[in-house]
């Protein structure tokens, strides 16, 4: 779980979508001693441009240095420190759950429906479930599934945008 502690920052960056950019961005954080808790990268609304969402910890002074240094990288187009209260964050989780009996399957399906998830794969002794939402929702869902036995788990980590009509 990525908890938003006071020294945790959500940094959104638009970058050129080409090889080596992620490595240069991560290297900048490493050199400054600014720990990356999570990073997600994907295409944006503009062809050839990717959006990075970086969850990182550090004080405001270090964040200001990082933001300035990111803006100096040739492949970085724009950087913004997102205010947690004015940000929409979501992540995706896929979890394979041990479910050999009909009663266990039924209970897992009920939990999945309550959390508005989807069953994406079924095998004789397991269900694979997909759920999206904020980190707290996913943590709560996983806590319920732990009683059945989690066989495999994959989480994307949060991706984020500013609320309202404001854009990068």
From Swiss-Prot:
Catalysed reaction(s) here are: 2 pyruvate + H(+) = (2S)-2-acetolactate + CO2
Gene3D superfamilies per UniProt:
3.30.70.260, ACT-like. Chain A, domain 2 (3.30.70.1150)
InterPro entries reported for this sequence: Acetalactate_synth_ssu, Acetolactate_synth/TF_NikR_C, Acetolactate_synth_ssu_C, ACT-like_dom_sf, ACT_dom, AHAS_ACT, AHAS_small-like_ACT
| UniProt KW keywords | Amino-acid biosynthesis, Branched-chain amino acid biosynthesis, Transferase
Q: Which GO terms describe its molecular function?
A: acetolactate synthase activity; acetolactate synthase regulator activity
Q: Where is the ACT domain?
A: 10-84
One GO cellular component term of this record is: cytosol
Which pathway is recorded for this entry?
A: Amino-acid biosynthesis; L-isoleucine biosynthesis; L-isoleucine from 2-oxobutanoate: step 1/4; Amino-acid biosynthesis; L-valine biosynthesis; L-valine from pyruvate: step 1/4
This protein's assembly is summarised as: Dimer of large and small chains.
Q: Identify this protein by name.
A: Probable acetolactate synthase small subunit
Species of provenance: Methanothermobacter thermautotrophicus (strain ATCC 29096 / DSM 1053 / JCM 10044 / NBRC 100330 / Delta H) (Methanobacterium thermoautotrophicum)
């Amino acid at each position: 779980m990525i908890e938003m502690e006071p020294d945790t920052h959500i940094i959104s960056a638009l970058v050129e979508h080409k090889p080596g950019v992620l490595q240069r961005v991560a290297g900048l954080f490493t050199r400054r001693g600014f720990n990356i808790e999570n990073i997600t990268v994907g295409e944006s609304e503009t062809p050839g441009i990717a959006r990075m969402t970086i969850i990182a910890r550090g004080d405001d002074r270090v964040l200001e240095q990082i933001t300035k240094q990111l803006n100096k990288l040739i492949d970085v187009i724009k950087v913004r420190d997102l205010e947690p209260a004015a940000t929409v964050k979501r992540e995706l989780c896929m979890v394979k759950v041990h479910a050999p009996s009909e009663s266990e399957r039924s209970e897992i399906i009920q939990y999945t429906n309550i959390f508005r998830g989807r069953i994406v794969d079924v095998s004789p002794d397991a269900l694979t479930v997909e759920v999206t939402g904020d980190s707290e929702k996913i943590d709560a869902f996983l806590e319920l599934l732990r009683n059945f036995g989690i066989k495999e788990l994959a989480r994307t980590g949060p991706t984020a945008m500013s609320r309202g009509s404001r854009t990068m």
